[in-house]
Amino acid sequence: MITTDDALATLCEAVREFPAIALDTEFVRTRTYYPQLGLIQLFDGKHVALIDPQGITDWSPLRDILRDTAITKFLHAGSEDLEVFLNTFGELPQPLIDTQILAAFCGRPLSWGFAAMVEEFTGVALDKSESRTDWLARPLTERQCEYAAADVWYLLPITTKLMVETEASGWLPAALDECRLMQQRRQEVLAPEDAWRDITNAWQLRTRQLACLQLLADWRLRKARERDLAVNFVVREEHLWSV
């Protein structure tokens, strides 16, 4: 477990020797607008590291790794992880390859889960029961740590097989383009004046009703960001309709 600035710096220096790493995060997002980082997992083929954000004050070594284009970063279904990295560090992993995207271009389901991927490639059935536990509580349990480590331990070896398979299929350039598009989309910030578009059936409203909803949705999103509170904890969607 990496719990100090010195330990993080030492880890990141060692990681620079490797061409690729697997990354994952554990976070909590129940009442907050922004995800609350609970743990970062990293595997470079030699070192499995669990990085405890509660003990780190200097993130510059990890930021340097995230932006180091000589090190490919692999994630699986990493859209939410990218949001965590962007909100916490102001950085996105570069370059990034998402194994769920690779798998989709090889004919797997679009939302192919990590456990299903691991079972197909290794025959191991992962226990995912820890996924919804409290990652902000300390100390983390042994089962939580084992669960978190497995997410990167299995990911990195599988990436090699998936890269070969995707290249053989002729879809690798398209898959890499899709990974870049995912990063671009994650950097797009929803403008408060467009928040009404995320409200179910808003298109059915009449002109004056829609104008009112647009103002309310704008205000709700601004308040949610200002107070770091999930939008439905500011005002529930059904209550917007009643107004």
Where are these regions (language model features)?
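DEDD superfamily 3′-5′ metal-dependent exonuclease/proofreading module
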Residues: 1-243
